[in-house]
């Protein structure tokens, strides 16, 4: 069988199980922990890549997923990860990061076997320890690779379905509120401010701005380009900012937004000037949107560059201030804006906007619309 065929067989076997068929309680606990460790998804993806390599080539050692190790028992775990797992994970909406585990700081540049006597430096420590123990369980024939892979998929499928059930329940609650008085602009500001105040919310200011163009783009005769991945560097994407805006019917960027979860500094302004100078086409304005306070001296410095940049305006906006002004300016579109923001939040990968953050937003919106 090909690796793709192996994956489909493992999936079918996992889907047919209602409970674990692993008798060993310690192994069962280990795989459950690795699969359900939400703070770091590299462990389960590493485990799946190594198991797939073992199932495809039974002679290899699942603890040797690096060709640099050498010998007939080593293999490229990254090749299995990127060539087969990425598509499989996406097609089946498995709750795992969309990028390979082998490029994470803990797992790249390794040239030795992943044995339990060599600690991997990463957090949580227990995740890597249990992952290595599972690989050793397979290497020492304490459990078959296919049985462990099926159990891994069974847990991931259960997690996916649990997550979907929670989302469906929250969305159903929101639908019951449809037809009632829509939230005021100020209530929406409060709602999104509460969301921005949550942990791990660094992606949200990007969505605050992007939602404005989704809701009002046609009236502005402008559109925002599709967002780049949250962890994509400007040098990789060639983008000017986190949100890039074009005029309708034109692909040239005229406005760029850069989001900051901290104060904007003069160095940030200088970096923007360099990007503006290197841009293939002249833009009209470059706007920083920050969740921190705006330093008046830095704002003045940005304003002073208008003539030096030949008419490109650089300014610093407060994120909540931007939102409040937009909602009052387009008051009739406030519900469209809120729906656009919700859609963007829910469509982001969990690596950018975590599942907890998505559920928090729906809960906050339900509470706001019900008057709780």
Show where each model-derived region lies.
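Secondary-structure junction/capping motif
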Residues: 76, 144, 179-187, 200, ...
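Interfaces and regulatory segments of ATP-dependent nucleotide/adenylate/phosphodiester-chemistry enzymes
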Residues: 4-188, 328-372
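Catalytic core segments in nucleotide and nucleic-acid processing enzymes
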Residues: 203-207, 212-372
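Short N-terminal helix-initiation segments at or just after the protein's N-terminus
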Residues: 181-192, 222-232
């Amino acid at each position: 069988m090909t690796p793709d065929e192996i994956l489909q067989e493992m999936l079918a076997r996992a889907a047919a199980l209602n409970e674990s068929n692993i008798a060993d309680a310690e192994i069962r606990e280990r795989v459950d922990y690795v699969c359900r460790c939400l703070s770091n998804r590299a462990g389960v993806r590493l485990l799946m890549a190594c198991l797939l390599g073992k199932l495809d080539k039974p002679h290899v050692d699942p603890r040797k997923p690096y060709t640099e190790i050498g010998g007939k028992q080593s293999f490229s775990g990254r090749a299995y990860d990127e060539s087969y797992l990425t598509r499989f994970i996406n097609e089946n909406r498995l709750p795992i990061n969309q990028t390979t585990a082998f490029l994470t700081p803990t797992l790249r540049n390794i040239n030795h076997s992943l044995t339990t006597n060599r600690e991997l430096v990463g957090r949580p420590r227990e995740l890597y320890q249990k992952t290595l123990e599972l690989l050793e369980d397979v290497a020492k024939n304490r459990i078959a690779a296919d049985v462990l892979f099926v159990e891994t998929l069974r847990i991931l499928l259960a997690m996916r379905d649990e997550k979907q059930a929670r989302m469906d329940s929250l969305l159903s609650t929101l639908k019951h509120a449809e037809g009632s008085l829509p939230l005021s602009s100020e209530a929406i500001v409060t709602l999104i401010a509460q969301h921005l105040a949550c942990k791990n919310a660094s992606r949200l200011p990007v969505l605050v701005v992007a939602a404005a163009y989704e809701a009002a783009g046609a009236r502005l005769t402008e559109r925002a380009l599709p967002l780049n991945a949250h962890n994509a560097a400007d040098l990789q994407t060639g983008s000017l900012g986190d949100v890039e805006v074009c005029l309708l019917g034109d692909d040239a960027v005229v406005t760029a937004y850069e989001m900051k979860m901290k104060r904007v500094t003069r160095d940030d302004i200088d970096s923007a000037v360099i990007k503006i100078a290197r841009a293939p086409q002249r833009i009209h304005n470059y706007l920083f949107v920050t969740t921190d306070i705006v330093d008046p001296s830095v704002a003045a410095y940005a304003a002073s560059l208008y003539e030096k940049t030949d008419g490109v305006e650089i300014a610093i906006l407060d994120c909540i201030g931007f939102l409040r002004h937009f909602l009052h300016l387009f008051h009739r579109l406030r519900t469209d804006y809120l729906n656009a923001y919700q859609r963007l939040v829910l469509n982001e990968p969990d690596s950018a906007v975590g599942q907890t953050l998505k559920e928090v937003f729906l809960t906050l919106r339900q509470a706001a619309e019900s008057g709780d």
